[in-house]
Amino acid sequence: IIDINFYENEEFLKNLKSRCHSCRNLMYEKIKRYALENGFDYICDGNNISDLVADRPGILITYGMEFNTPLIEAKLTSKEIHEYLEKNNIPYSRSTTCLATRIPTNTKITKDKIEKIKKSEKILSKISGCELVKVRNFNKVSVCEINNFSKIINNNSFNELNNQLKLVGYEKVCLNL
């Protein structure tokens, strides 16, 4: 494991439109340095074909640093990879975007905001029963996103969610339907 403290990186904290690019550049520079210092000849990136059509500005770093992309070369999509893993009972964690993406661009990133988002997403996941959740942070307003809101609406769980997220520090809790 390569240790990186993103809170020491001003480009990351500024949260400009180029944040993803700067962040990935920081990570990949450290990975490449480690690989060179330890005699690795081959560095692989886990991006797949689905990542090429998503809004992923940091993906250009992969090619700029000459990392190998075997899943893209094999033309595999996220869906195909997940189906293969499930079919073969290979444990994996569903990917989700960086928590910094929950903070609006040009709004300063702080450790407190990231911790608040992390805590809120654990609460949302527990109450909704959904594995993939997002809580977007708009200062005192949280915007919750999950793939199946019926679990919250049908079970009358919104009041519990509202109360729990207000304890975290939000004044208003919204569902993005």
Spans of model-derived segments:
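Peripheral terminal appendages
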Residues: 39, 112-177
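ATP-dependent adenylation/nucleotidyltransferase module used to activate substrates
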Residues: 1-87, 142, 156-171, 175
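A short, flexible beta-alpha/helix-coil linker loop
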Residues: 7, 104-106, 149-150
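Proline- and acidic/polar-enriched loop/turn elements at helix boundaries
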Residues: 3-4, 47, 94-98, 137, ...
